[in-house]
Amino acid sequence: MEFTLEATSKNARACTIKTAHSTIKTPVFMPVGTLGSVKALDMEDVLDLLGAEIILANTYHMYLRPGDETVAKMGKLHGFTTYPKSFLTDSGGFQAFSLSDISKASENGIEFRSHIDGSKHFFTPKKVIDIQHNLGSDIMMILDDLVALPATGERIALSIERTTAWAKESIEYFRKKQKEGIGAEQNIFAIIQGGTDKAFRTKSATELCALDFDGFAIGGLSVGELNNEMYDTVEHTVKYMPKDKPRYLMGVGTPEDLIENIERGIDMFDCVMPTRNARNGTLFTSFGRLNIKGATYKEDAQPVDSECECLTCKRYSRAYLNHLFRSREIAYFRLATIHNLHYYLNLMREAREAILEDKYAEFKAEFYRKRG
Amino acid sequence: MEFTLEATSKNARACTIKTAHSTIKTPVFMPVGTLGSVKALDMEDVLDLLGAEIILANTYHMYLRPGDETVAKMGKLHGFTTYPKSFLTDSGGFQAFSLSDISKASENGIEFRSHIDGSKHFFTPKKVIDIQHNLGSDIMMILDDLVALPATGERIALSIERTTAWAKESIEYFRKKQKEGIGAEQNIFAIIQGGTDKAFRTKSATELCALDFDGFAIGGLSVGELNNEMYDTVEHTVKYMPKDKPRYLMGVGTPEDLIENIERGIDMFDCVMPTRNARNGTLFTSFGRLNIKGATYKEDAQPVDSECECLTCKRYSRAYLNHLFRSREIAYFRLATIHNLHYYLNLMREAREAILEDKYAEFKAEFYRKRG
């Protein structure tokens, strides 16, 4: 991975990340393709309509179905899904923790039951790297020890200790495998934990950033804390992260969250919000959110967002989308998803332009002004 | 509507139908867009990926939701849906008859309750023309009196009598409105009834074809009768239909049904089969049907049909589609629908080529040979 920090506007950064499969310009929002499909879209949509240079897939989901060995046989993620740009895969730890009825973290890893058939599985730091080798993702994530909040300080301390130990095991195994020619073109990121406690975040960031990872993520946020707690935690944690490597804030967030965290020095984001909300009827626009099922749109001939250049806004009226939503037509899901992801990706392109011109503060002010 | 009979190959016909919105080359299969959306596709798919020159919408459904007056305000079907080519709308009689809990046909029309909210409605021959004026379809269908089979000869005779009476009322009203400038660019087809009884079909066809309709449909087939009964009924009925007007077989059918009925002189078809079966996992190919959920496709790197030029076959493997289907990914529905409709529309293009070369019998033999 080649990383170039091109410009800053105060703490906001415009970078370029070059993987074996694409050149990613940051700030970047990565659409979520849990099962190797960005929900409701096909890969031509992702490429031609959205121009996404990187998407996510979930290790937990692909491991269970169709199975990472099947994916490997079918040409890894790139061959199987036909998406030729970059994939980032999470470690599966979060899903093992949150989707499984039983999930037990021990010193060696996380035991869980499949949410599909109840079968028992055990994820270890090495095991999730093996799986991600099979998936062939451009950026893989380490297994981290997650804690259900609220938790005692003792439990959080244990989580950080374990995450650091697993990170050491992960990076040693990953680099050793690379020397053997396995995953030579892949990259690996560590995940900083510590909740909203600054001392814990300092400790976790300091320990992990001393290791030879290709990039670093901030995990464990956007789990119910106040927005300001999230922003403060990011602002604090970023200080302990290297300037010459990518910074990824996992599972965040609203357009406002993106704007705020870019200002605090984050380069990469992912979230199910634009895709999931699209399916539920919530569309993001330059003037705020719009719930397309509202009766007020029944005979509204305007596009969702007159400033938007997406297929949906260029072609269809709110009235037609309102009708498709109310009639539960499948076509609605794709059109709404295209719009929301286009909005997110375009917002990132505009943020980048502003950083390159060192006008991020003005850009942010204008972003909020339009929302009134 | 301009109708040109270009070529025949025995009884099979290649025609051109020119409406105010498109030039339709027959034999033609019309994708079903019940609610103004071909399920799982958007109109760019229908235009650019399928090249469809005519699609269906259902009067019953559009009347109930969003309402034909809303559609009229939003620019009729063409403006509302953005599909710029031809629309055919049925009369709503079939849905009023089949989707409603209560449905009573009387001398004057059909009373029914909405399947959405239970509200009471009454369709008359004039009322469904008024609705179709609001929808702005290029081809509208008359209200016909449907009979649940099996029925007594007496009831079928009454159905034919009523359908003829309603047809007379319809064509008078439609032409009168045209003189007033309403529906001047629209066309209207009558629907021949009579089950699989040849005497009844003769009577219905003779009576209706004496009237000034723009085309004629054969209704009341593909309702559970044997294939040969359907084919025999079509073969018989076609003899009483004019050569210089389009012939439309409603609600039919499988690829085999299309091939057989083209041979018997049918020009136009519609059916939910390619779209509905796609969603259920059944894909149509040049070598027969394929159920994509089968475990045998889990690691099958081939396209669905190696002879197919659709987006789905050019880009994706059976393995990926199998995975999307099994994972219930929304993207599956669109990719499968694109394939099945592409197959149907392409089959019609090939049939047309064969007719133009007067080689329909050879084409049909080859069609069956490939299926083994």
UniProtKB/Swiss-Prot annotation, chains A, B:
Q: An example Gene Ontology cellular component term from the record?
A: cytosol
Q: In which pathway does it act?
A: tRNA modification; tRNA-queuosine biosynthesis
**Which reaction equations make up its catalytic activity?**
7-aminomethyl-7-carbaguanine + guanosine(34) in tRNA = 7-aminomethyl-7-carbaguanosine(34) in tRNA + guanine
Output the lineage of the source organism: Bacteria, Pseudomonadati, Campylobacterota, Epsilonproteobacteria, Campylobacterales
- Which species is the source of this protein? Sulfurimonas denitrificans (strain ATCC 33889 / DSM 1251) (Thiomicrospira denitrificans (strain ATCC 33889 / DSM 1251))
Which NCBIfam families does its entry note?
Q_tRNA_tgt (TIGR00430), tgt_general (TIGR00449)
Q: What class of enzyme is it?
A: transferase
- Write one Gene Ontology MF term: metal ion binding
Q: Name the residues that bind substrate.
A: D90, S91, G92, G93, F94, D144, Q193, G220
**Ranges where the record places region RNA binding:** 251-257, 275-279
Q: Which GO terms describe its biological process?
A: queuosine biosynthetic process; tRNA-guanine transglycosylation
Q: Which gene encodes it?
A: tgt
User: What are the positions of the active site?
Assistant: D90 (proton acceptor), D270 (nucleophile)
- Pfam families, A to Z: TGT (PF01702)
What PANTHER family does this protein's entry cite? QUEUINE TRNA-RIBOSYLTRANSFERASE CATALYTIC SUBUNIT 1
Family membership: Belongs to the queuine tRNA-ribosyltransferase family.
Q: How is the cofactor bound?
A: Binds 1 zinc ion per subunit.
Cofactor field: Zn(2+)
- The record lists Zn(2+) as bound by C308, C310, C313, H339
What is the name of the protein in this document? Queuine tRNA-ribosyltransferase
Query: What EC numbers are recorded for this enzyme?
Result: 2.4.2.29
Q: What does this protein do?
A: Catalyzes the base-exchange of a guanine (G) residue with the queuine precursor 7-aminomethyl-7-deazaguanine (PreQ1) at position 34 (anticodon wobble position) in tRNAs with GU(N) anticodons (tRNA-Asp, -Asn, -His and -Tyr). Catalysis occurs through a double-displacement mechanism. The nucleophile active site attacks the C1' of nucleotide 34 to detach the guanine base from the RNA, forming a covalent enzyme-RNA intermediate. The proton acceptor active site deprotonates the incoming PreQ1, allowing a nucleophilic attack on the C1' of the ribose to form the product.
Show the InterPro entries listed in the entry.
TGT (IPR004803), TGT-like_sf (IPR036511), tRNA_ribo_trans-like (IPR002616)
Subunit (UniProt): Homodimer. Within each dimer, one monomer is responsible for RNA recognition and catalysis, while the other monomer binds to the replacement base PreQ1.
| Keyword list, A-Z | Glycosyltransferase, Metal-binding, Queuosine biosynthesis, Transferase, tRNA processing, Zinc
